[in-house]
């Protein structure tokens, strides 16, 4: 018997925006940015660490716009899926020709309705974005950062002028991926009051959580789950933080008050990545271990070296 595995890279990024893992209010906000006439322009930052769904997110959000009534263009290192009605420009650093910043500037000068940039490789690209006609053009800018706040800081620093950067900002979407528990073998358990307290979950409202299994009972004997091959997980979903940047937030950006901006994002009432992940754990979609994995503080290289020296 011969088995063959066929992998189509395009399928990996071919998802609708309402199937990314966005919570309902998050999807509604992004959809409003794409469809409401009064919110035509501005920069929306799309943030995710490497290999955490940034391309899938950008493709899905682009497809919320009507490609037949809008001039939509993208600048990418590689086209991972052909998007109907969208002009996808491939920029290759190994080829002779204009650099990324120049390609960005010339694209923005053609008055497109929507432009998506796969990366922010240099400060000149950021400055070209900030100096373009952002009242008429929507720019989706992909950044390799691990939080909504960090993506705003990265963009503002690259522009070099907080007032100019803040003026054009519309919103930010941050994403991290968690693994989805296998529905065939996940194991329910009752969390302790102490555990719920540490997670910030209300006692009495969360009856059970789930953890990975990997095995199922067949005739009262444990066997490896045939669905997930014993891994305990099957697939991935996104946990998002979606925030609108209004007058208050823009003023805080101009002042460089990052703690104030963090507080303003919390007060806005939209779920953060951590809150989104916890909701998915309560819903039985993922495990607390996955929530901890994506929300635990990342150790910097300098701190790692320091700890090794001390050890």
Predicted regions and their residues:
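Short, flexible helix-loop junctions that flank or precede catalytic/ligand sites
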Residues: 1-311
């Amino acid at each position: 018997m011969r088995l063959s595995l066929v992998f189509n890279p395009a399928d990996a990024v071919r998802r609708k925006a309402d199937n990314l893992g966005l919570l309902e209010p998050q999807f509604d906000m992004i959809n409003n940015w794409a469809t409401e006439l009064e919110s035509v322009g501005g920069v929306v930052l799309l943030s995710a660490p490497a290999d955490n769904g940034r391309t899938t997110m950008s493709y899905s959000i682009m497809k919320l716009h009507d490609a037949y009534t809008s001039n939509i263009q993208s600048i990418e290192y590689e086209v991972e899926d052909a998007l109907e009605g969208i002009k996808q420009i491939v920029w290759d650093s190994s080829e002779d020709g204009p650099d990324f910043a120049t390609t960005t500037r010339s694209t923005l000068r053609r008055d497109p309705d929507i432009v998506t940039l796969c990366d922010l490789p240099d400060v000149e690209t950021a400055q070209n974005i900030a100096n373009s006609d952002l009242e008429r053009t929507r720019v989706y800018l992909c950044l390799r950062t691990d939080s909504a706040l960090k993506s705003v800081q990265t963009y503002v620093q690259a522009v070099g002028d907080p007032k100019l950067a803040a003026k054009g900002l519309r919103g930010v979407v941050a994403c991290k991926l968690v693994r989805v528990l296998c529905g065939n073998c996940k194991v329910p358990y009752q969390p302790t009051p102490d555990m719920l307290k540490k997670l910030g979950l209300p006692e009495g409202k969360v009856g059970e959580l789930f953890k990975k299994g990997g095995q199922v009972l067949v005739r009262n004997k444990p066997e490896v789950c045939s669905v997930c091959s014993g891994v305990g997980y099957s697939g991935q979903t996104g946990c998002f933080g979606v925030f609108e940047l209004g007058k208050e937030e823009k003023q805080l950006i101009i002042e460089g008050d990052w703690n104030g901006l963090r507080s303003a994002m919390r007060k806005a009432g939209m779920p953060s990545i951590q809150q989104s992940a916890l909701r998915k754990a309560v819903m039985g979609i993922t495990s607390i271990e996955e929530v901890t994995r994506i929300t635990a503080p990342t150790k910097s290289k300098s701190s790692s070296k320091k700890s090794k020296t001390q050890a």
